[in-house]
UniProtKB/Swiss-Prot annotation:
GO terms for biological process: regulation of transcription elongation by RNA polymerase II; RNA polymerase II transcription initiation surveillance; snRNA 3'-end processing; snRNA processing. This is Integrator complex subunit 2. Component of the integrator complex, a multiprotein complex that terminates RNA polymerase II (Pol II) transcription in the promoter-proximal region of genes. Keywords: Cytoplasm, Membrane, Nucleus, Transmembrane, Transmembrane helix. The gene is INTS2. The keyword Transmembrane applies. Belongs to the Integrator subunit 2 family. Component of the Integrator complex, composed of core subunits INTS1, INTS2, INTS3, INTS4, INTS5, INTS6, INTS7, INTS8, INTS9/RC74, INTS10, INTS11/CPSF3L, INTS12, INTS13, INTS14 and INTS15. The core complex associates with protein phosphatase 2A subunits PPP2CA and PPP2R1A, to form the Integrator-PP2A (INTAC) complex.
């Protein structure tokens, strides 16, 4: 085997190959260049040149005719041309037929070497036969030999064999054999495909030489031949004789055509075959390019294979490296050895002053180690050094390369060299440090370990200088700190992730291999106290954003906060975190939110139970206010902002998260002597939360998860800022319409000042034009631009209540208020509530605060009574009421949690052993009861507002239901009737206010159905039932609790329940309504038997009209209701029988009406029955009740007869 390899290496050394110059001339058919070739070079190309000269060309141009003459002149003096001409004179058609017959014969004989049709029995050896034969026979000899080899190749199933052939081995006849081979392939391409011929030539001696000549005479076939050889090649070429021969042949081809060498290398990678060839071609290219300072092609190529995204290529090349190391022989002929040697030479070529660990020992005696021994890495070599380090990391970590002692020594020297303070230098130091962690086996001797410690100490000393000089925020100092923290907290897996991330590759690092490095870091270089003290002094990253990659101070601080190092060693970190939050920009860095969360945890949770006071300090209120300077009020809101919107949003996230965590940890904090305090309500009032949330909404892509986190905190702590109507209104304000309005924005709209607006309001209602013009212009401004006008708008709302103010002004003010509500709701609400207080002479108005309104939301409804009949301002009032009701719930829940910590101590003093949970339950129940009372009171007040005042009744406003009012307008036919009714129509102020109130009540009932139940158990004026049932869509939920309401012992509640049910049955004629109505009829029948005379009159007089509604909604109840009515009449008649006999005819009529309703239909239409002709005021209550029964029956009959 070894002899065969030696033969392969030396077989072609004495032969002359086609030069790159000659091949290029053949490719381009450059006759001038061909004429300049020497005779030996020209001899190799004769087959192609002779064919060009003799065969009829496809190109009939004059230029080719001249070139052809030059070729003929060139060939005229060459003796070998005659023999090639003779070869071309043979009958190739007959030759091809004989070859085909021989192929068929061999196929039948199973590939055996039987009688040949092409060549008769040979008298002598193949070489002598070739020498004595004429041209036709020479063609047959070579063709027969070639076909035999090709057949054997096809039958070998990929197993390589070496075929000994005199014809291809005799140095005397190589050129003649090559001529014959080229002519055969050119004239018989279908019989001898060039790729198959190339494959066959690999199996004979001098095959690479023959292959190069063949391709040189058919230069267009170069890529086809190379691709075919690579495709049929081995996955690992250095493992077999065939692979090495194939690699050598392709290498010779690429030397002949160097311009295509890299393309051939690309084919190698694409097919994942012949890795040695890819490396060999790269080595050849590297030697030719002579690149000293830049990264060599070899480094780029191998790095691309191992660090690329193609896992198949990575595995294929890694196998090549591993297999190469497993072979015991590692001679200079090995491609892997050549590659390693070349890489080592490149590494040594960029090293600073050559030094070793021995020099360190000598230097320690007489000089400082950083004077001359540790000379720096040249700036032009830094990038190349980084690339080499990454390549060696990939070779060792991915491909499993085991470095030799020399390689390890030189690598350690390079890693511990000192680069200049440039961004590339920072990158190089980070890579070197991570490589030391990943491959600690490179440090094997005490001297090398000392060298590493000295270098790490230099890193710590020079870190600040590097950061200031290079201008790179992500310096290696942060990485040192981070690794030290990970070692102290024994987070070895985190170190491994950090190393892999920095190196940019996933390599296997055993945690046990880091044990020595851990000892060095934690005991010699970075103690935990040193790490903590140093971290605070690290400058914050300026304009920190996600665009700044790498390991930053924020990563170190985050890990130290997680491990509670700051509190453990009593180091204040609050100022650093505050400064870093101020120095932020978009896109948001992903480490900022986790940093805030862990910082809040360190404020509220002690580091250890033994030291409960070991916590960090929270950010002060003044520092928070400084962040929002320019956003808190002021006319120039856009000009005064010192800090970015990112910083403001992060501080808002900190405050909301802090308050939430404070409430969640009240029981834990109760044990602390120095308890963290909640931020004051005055501070929260000054922060424009809604404005900031709106800003965040437009920056969702750049803020990552911050916007969604803020929405979650807002929904939990400030539900009144998350009202659905507000979001819908916001969509309208920020949508397409807003863009169109901005296009209409004129300079006049921008020039109106708040002072001008105040002067215009002062002229109302005498002069409405000016204020109308200004506020119409203001509608074109954005929400943030309207903020300076908020105080003027709200303070003048009370003037708008005076008579004579146009509705358009009111509606425009309402529109502006809603726009302002999207950016400053809390401040706006407080100003509006104070502005709408009733003006009482000689009584000083109280100025309410945000806290007052959250404690008692009903203050909102203690406004000027004129607001109740001003729909645009009532809409604003209802909006505020809804918000403050929600805010009150959140406030009380937070207050309950805040004061929870005081309860256990009180329980202990009382001595309620084993009942410590009872007070909490009671407090929760009391809170819920308070909230329910608050909500129900608000509903009752709103319902009372829906009732017409005495003045409105005097003016003829109809207090009837919304449903009946709508029907009356629809059915009115007289054109002048609407004029007579005045404002009693769908557009009157009372009707509009009723609609607004019904909408709010609907929302409240849907949000909490218990409110509806509580309100209806309390009851309200029955005149409002038509309005509430028709105007509140969610009133159908009352059907669930009406049976319970009817079962109440109070007669008033029973009456209210039946009246409510009668309206619900008309509005919702559902099976459920029918069952409840049937229950009500049965209850009425039961009560008839138990009620006294007075209570009977009080109960049935208001409820009997409800029976008509039951029948109208559900005709099947007709029989039961008629029986009930007659039963009531009989009971009443029996009570008055002894006093008067007038009642008997009524009972008789009732019986007749029930039995023959059709006969009484005309009588029922008589006005005396409908209106009642008798004086009921002086009648007995039972008599009055009987007459009421009669009217009810007649109404039911009229309804049934008319088909209604």
């Amino acid at each position: 085997m070894k002899d065969q390899q030696t033969v392969i290496m030396t077989e072609c050394t004495s032969l002359q190959f086609v030069s790159p110059f000659a091949f290029e001339a053949m490719q381009k058919v450059d006759v001038v260049c061909l004429a300049s070739l020497s005779d030996p070079e020209l001899r190799l190309l004769l087959p192609c040149l002779v064919r060009m000269a003799l065969c009829a060309p496809a190109d009939q141009s004059q230029s080719w005719a001249q070139d052809k003459k030059l070729i003929l002149r060139l060939l005229s003096g060459v003796e070998a041309v005659n023999s090639i001409v003779a070869l071309l004179s043979v009958d190739f058609h007959a030759l091809e037929q004989d070859a085909s017959k021989e192929q068929q014969l061999r196929h039948k004989l199973g590939g055996g070497s039987g009688e040949s049709i092409l060549v008769s029995q040979l008298q002598h050896g193949l070489t002598l036969e070739f020498e004595h034969s004429d041209s036709p026979r020479r063609l047959r000899l070579v063709l027969s030999e070639l076909l035999a080899i090709m057949n054997k190749v096809s039958e070998s199933n990929g197993e390589f064999f070496f075929k000994s052939s005199e014809l291809f081995e005799s140095p005397v006849y190589l050129e003649e054999a090559a001529d014959v081979l080229c002519i055969l392939q050119a004239e018989l391409p279908s019989l001898l495909p060039i790729v198959d011929v190339a494959e066959a030539l690999l199996h004979v001696r001098n095959g690479a030489w023959f292959l190069c000549l063949l391709v040189a005479n058919v230069p267009d076939s170069f890529n086809e031949v190379c691709r075919g050889l690579i495709k049929n090649g081995e996955r690992q070429d250095e493992e077999s004789l065939g692979g090495r021969r194939r690699t050598d042949a392709l290498r010779f081809l690429c030397k002949m055509n160097p311009s295509q060498a890299l393309k051939v290398r690309g084919m190698v990678v694409e097919e994942c075959h012949l890795p040695g060839l890819g490396v060999a071609l790269t080595l050849d290219h590297t030697k030719n390019e002579a690149c000293e300072d830049g990264v060599s092609d070899l480094v780029c190529f191998v790095s691309g294979l191992l660090l690329g995204t193609n896992a198949k290529v990575r595995t294929w090349f890694g196998t090549f490296i591993r297999n190469g190391q497993q072979r015991k022989r590692e001679t200079s002929s090995s491609v892997l050895w050549q590659m390693r040697r070349q890489l080592l030479l490149e590494l040594m070529g960029i090293l600073p002053t050559v030094r070793s660990t021995r020099i360190v020992e000598e230097a320690d005696v007489d000089m400082e180690p950083n004077v001359s021994v540790y000379s720096g890495l040249k700036e032009e070599h830094v990038v190349k050094a980084s690339a080499l380090l990454r390549l060696y990391c990939a070779l060792m970590g991915i491909a499993g390369l085991k470095p030799t002692e020399e390689e390890a020594e030189q690598l350690l020297q390079l890693m511990t060299s000192r680069p200049p303070a440039t961004p590339a230098g920072v990158r190089f130091v980070s890579l070197s440090f991570c490589m030391l962690l990943a491959f600690s086996t490179l440090v094997s001797t005490p001297e090398q370990e000392q060298l590493m410690v000295v270098w790490l100490s230099w890193m710590i000393k020079e870190e600040a200088y590097f950061e200031s000089t290079s201008g790179v925020s992500a310096s290696f100092g942060e990485m040192l700190l981070l690794v030290a923290m990970y070692f102290h907290s024994n987070q070895l897996s985190a170190i491994i992730d950090l190393v892999c991330s920095t190196l940019g590759m996933k390599i296997v690092i055993k945690p046990s291999s880091l044990s020595r490095m851990k000892t060095i870091f934690t005991q010699e270089i970075f103690t935990e106290q040193v790490v903590t003290a140093h971290a605070v002094r690290v400058p914050v990253t300026s304009n920190l954003s996600a665009n700044i990659t790498g390991f930053l101070p924020i990563h170190c601080i985050y890990q130290l906060l997680r491990s509670r190092s700051f509190t453990k060693h009593k180091v204040s970190i609050k100022d650093w975190i505050y400064r870093q939050l101020c120095e932020t920009s978009t896109p948001l860095h992903p480490q900022l939110l986790p940093l805030i969360d862990v910082y809040i945890n360190s404020i509220l949770t002690p580091a250890s139970k033994s030291n409960p006071e070991a916590t960090n300090q929270p950010v002060t209120e003044q520092e928070i206010l400084n962040i929002f300077q320019g956003v808190i009020g002021g006319d120039n809101i856009r000009l005064n902002q010192r800090f970015s919107i990112t910083a403001q949003l992060l501080v808002l996230y900190y405050i909301l998260s802090y308050e939430e965590a404070l409430l969640a940890n009240t029981k834990t904090l109760a044990a602390m002597q120095r308890k963290p305090k909640s931020y004051s309500s005055s501070l929260m009032d000054q922060i424009p939360i809604k404005f900031l949330i709106r800003q965040a909404q437009g920056l969702q892509q750049e803020l990552g998860g911050l916007h969604s986190a803020l929405l979650r905190l807002l929904a939990t702590n400030y539900p009144h800022l998350c009202i659905v109507d507000d979001w819908i209104c916001e969509e309208e304000i920020t949508g397409t319409d807003a863009l169109l309005r901005r296009m209409l924005l004129t300079n006049n709209a921008k020039n109106h000042s708040p002072k001008q607006l105040q002067e215009a309001f002062s002229a109302v209602p005498v002069n409405n034009t000016q204020v109308m013009q200004i506020i119409e212009h203001l509608t074109l401004l954005s929400a943030s631009e309207l903020i300076p006008y908020a105080e003027v708008l709200t303070s003048n709302m009370s003037q708008l209540l005076n008579s004579g103010v146009p509705r358009r002004i009111l509606q425009t003010v309402n529109k502006l208020w809603m726009v302002l509500n999207t950016v400053m709701p809390r401040r706006l609400w407080v100003m509006t509530v104070n502005a709408l207080q009733p003006s009482i002479k000689f009584v000083r108005q109280q100025k309410y605060t945000q806290n007052d309104l959250m404690i008692d939301p009903l203050i909102v409804l203690r406004c000027d009574q004129r607001v109740h009949r001003c729909p645009p301002l009532m809409d604003i009032t209802l909006h505020m009421l809804n918000g403050y009701l929600l805010a009150s719930k959140a406030y009380l829940s937070a207050h309950l949690k805040e004061t929870e910590q005081d309860r256990p101590s009180q329980n202990n003093t009382i001595g309620l052993v084993g009942q410590t949970d009872a007070p909490e339950v009671t407090r929760e129940e009391l809170k819920n009861a308070l909230l329910a009372a608050q909500d129900s009171a608000a509903v009752q007040i709103l319902l009372e507002i829906c009732l017409p005042t005495e003045e409105e009744k005097a003016n003829g406003v109809n207090p009837d239901s919304l449903l009946r009012n709508v029907q009356s307008v629809i059915t009115t036919s007289a054109p002048n009737k609407g004029m007579e009714e005045g404002e009693d129509n769908l557009l009157c102020n009372l009707r509009e206010v009723q609609c607004l109130i019904c909408c709010l009540l609907h929302q409240m009932y849907i949000a909490d159905p218990n409110i509806a139940k509580l309100v209806h158990f309390q009851g309200y004026p029955c005149e409002l039932l038509p309005l509430t049932v028709a105007g509140i869509p969610s009133m159908h939920i009352c059907l669930d609790f009406i049976p319970e309401l009817i079962a109440q012992p109070e007669l008033e509640k029973q009456i209210f329940a039946i009246q409510l049910l009668s309206h619900l049955c008309i509005q919702y004629a559902l099976p459920k309504s029918l069952s409840v109505a049937r229950l009500a009829v049965n209850v009425m029948g039961t009560l008839l038997t138990v009620l006294t005379q007075a209570k009977r009159y009080a109960f049935f007089m208001p409820t009997l009209p409800s029976l008509v509604s039951f029948c109208r909604a559900f005709p099947p109840l007709y029989e039961d209701i008629m029986s009930l009515l007659i039963q009531i009449g009989q009971v009443c008649a029996s009570d008055v029988a002894t006093q008067t006999r007038d009642i008997d005819p009524i009972i008789t009529r009732l019986q007749q009406i029930k039995e023959k309703p059709s006969g009484w239909s005309q009588i029922c239409k008589d006005s005396s029955y409908k209106n009642g002709s008798r004086d009921t005021g002086s009648m007995d209550p039972d008599v009055q009740l009987c007459h009421c029964i009669e009217r009810t029956v007649i109404e039911i009959i009229n309804m049934s007869v008319s088909g209604i």
